[in-house]
């Protein structure tokens, strides 16, 4: 199947925007994210045409589909929240395939400002990170790695060693050992469907501790 905006959809949006004041913020909910499937480097069909119709407004796309969690900033006033799934990996696991716990996102607008947080099922709203010790992460075995699933470019991820500030952690690509364990247990040695295989994600942050760190 193809993902994008059909010509008749663009015509509808163009007509609709004639009635929307320029001061209005826009929230566009759709199933597929603007970037399409995981790993895509180009936008879905006619995405740039849609952008041209809504440009000038503050625009937030809210999407799903991929069972991963990402925040994208396409332009100064055009961003997207691609939200992980409440069902994890189609009810087989407690985590989505990028390592995000199954859950949902809560949006609040107050005094003209939009805020949000990811609510992991079974946890309170402050549960926003999982930490992995050296030896646990497949692509960074010598590092402490933080999975900060709702990270966006406005966030800073920093670390301390034995109470001493060490600076910013390095943003890295990795896969979740928790999801890998869960999906392997669910399939019990059978071939895992391709769309459920562990996905590399860019919301991991790594730091290498010193030899004698406590």
Question: Which residues are covered by each model-predicted region?
Answer:
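Short small/polar-residue motifs
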Residues: 68-69, 101-105, 191-194
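His/acidic metal-ligating clusters that form di-metal
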Residues: 1-82, 142
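Binuclear metal-dependent phosphoesterase catalytic core
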Residues: 78-162, 204-214
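A short, hydrophobic/aromatic-rich structural module that often spans a beta strand
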Residues: 36, 40-43, 128-136, 171
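Structural signature of outer-membrane beta-barrel domains
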Residues: 35, 123-124, 166
